[in-house]
Amino acid sequence: MSEVNSFNINKNNVSQKERVLELAKRDLVSFGQLFLPGDYMKSSPAAYHYELSNLLLDSTKKRNCIILPRGHSKSTLAKTALLYHLYFNPEGKKEFIAWVAEEQSQAIDHIKYMQNHIEINPALNYYFGDLRGSKWTEKEFTTSKGDRVIAKGTSQRLRGRSQLGLRYTKIILDDFESELNTKTPDRRREIKEWVMSTVEPALENSAGNEGSIWLIGTIVHYDSFLQSIYDGYTEATRDERRYAWDVMYHKAIDGDGNVLWSSYFSKQKLADIRRRFEDVGLAHKFAQEYLNEARDLENAKFKTDRLEYYDHEFESKNNYAYLVNSKEAIPVNIYI
């Protein structure tokens, strides 16, 4: 992501350190550019990065569902948001956070990212001080402010856990659904029941400190939990009624050809990726990974593996239809 934007700060009234902290506090992109440049200076940010930043930093949003294409920094922004909260939370506000992935080992990798930056990131240590706590293992860590972060796998036990009387303030379900754990109707039902009967009751419910859930992922099955949340959201939006979840949903490229993150996934790059999927008969997998369209191939009326793709323009001439490019005009016959 590109250079940090300039902000309207009176440089004569604040120290250099205060200016940096004020910049970092504005949004997750600025925080990342200043303190996590390895991840945030590779490409210019897109509008959706700021949209996601606003969602994850809004303390009034307690049920967030973030559905983004593969490779579009959703997990990176979520980890950045947790670091932001750990460093900027006011004195006395403690976090008890569970990062949940499909397998616990995957969740461990994500909290290791946070541990590494807390431990050895010189900029964070200079501006905020040492945040390391007394417990520092691969599966969990604490901070010097009394926060606790643990790694869990999908379907693992969450209820009954607390940190000094505090139940979970945030539970992050990151890529918790996969093609493997959503293969059968029973497994899909088990995941839905686990979220509602295990994850939900594990949250802190004290007034003013209610816990939140972040669902983060790409839709992997048409009957997945993420898909059901999105379907409910679209119905509620259509009917103009309130919905329990705040939903953020994007495709890598929309129906009008607009690219979500043009500086990193250009239209040509996405076309090349699509072609590689098509060349091995997996066009539906591109739709799943980059368009968040998980399809029921067995019952689909139009089979994606039977589709043929043409780089032509559609033209109508003398009551006949053609697919036309610079080399040829192919007649198109439509039978209804």
Whereabouts are the PLM-identified features?
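Walker A/P-loop
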Residues: 61-81
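ASCE P-loop NTPase helicase motor core
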Residues: 183-258
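N-terminal accessory segments
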Residues: 1-62, 322-332
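ATPase catalytic-site recognition across NTP-hydrolyzing enzymes
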Residues: 257-336
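A short acidic (Asp/Glu
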Residues: 76-79, 108-112, 223-230
